[in-house]
Amino acid sequence: MITVTPLQLLGQDDRGSNFSWLTDRTGEFLLCYRHAGSSSGQHYHTGASANKNPEVMYLLNGQATLHWCTLNDITIHTVIATAPARIEVPANIWHQLIAVTDCTFIELNTVEDVRNDSIRIWKEDLEKTLMAR
């Protein structure tokens, strides 16, 4: 199951607002900008990369719809994330992010983590597999 957790609002005034989050991950991360209507993901991670087990991202602005399915499930589930929010995707969960609006997020992993631990399955192929079960 994908978990979406709103970030904690620390304070807000006429200048804007402040939020906090806690992470034990350090090093190189990905800053991603997505246009409304675009699709990302359509894959799952085996957990071979520590930074993909689980995959953690922070949605900084915008709204996204996440489609997800366990590898032995027969249903694709949907959850909506509205910034600011923390999104956690466990290993062996197929997932796809659709940007509802233009959005920005930080992935707490590197491109190398993605290359080493992403199994691509296009949504239409996943749906055919689920229908055959």
Show which residues each predicted segment covers.
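A short, N-terminal "cap"/entry segment at the start of jelly-roll beta-barrel domains
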Residues: 1-31
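Short, surface-exposed beta-strand-loop junctions and turns on beta-sheet-rich folds
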Residues: 48, 72-74, 112-113
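Short beta-strand His + acidic residue motifs that chelate non-heme Fe in jelly-roll/DSBH
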Residues: 18, 66-67, 87-89, 95-100, ...
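Short acidic-glycine-tyrosine-enriched beta hairpin
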Residues: 70-91
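Double-stranded beta-helix
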Residues: 96-133
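Conserved short histidine dyad/triad with adjacent acidic residue
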Residues: 11, 31-52
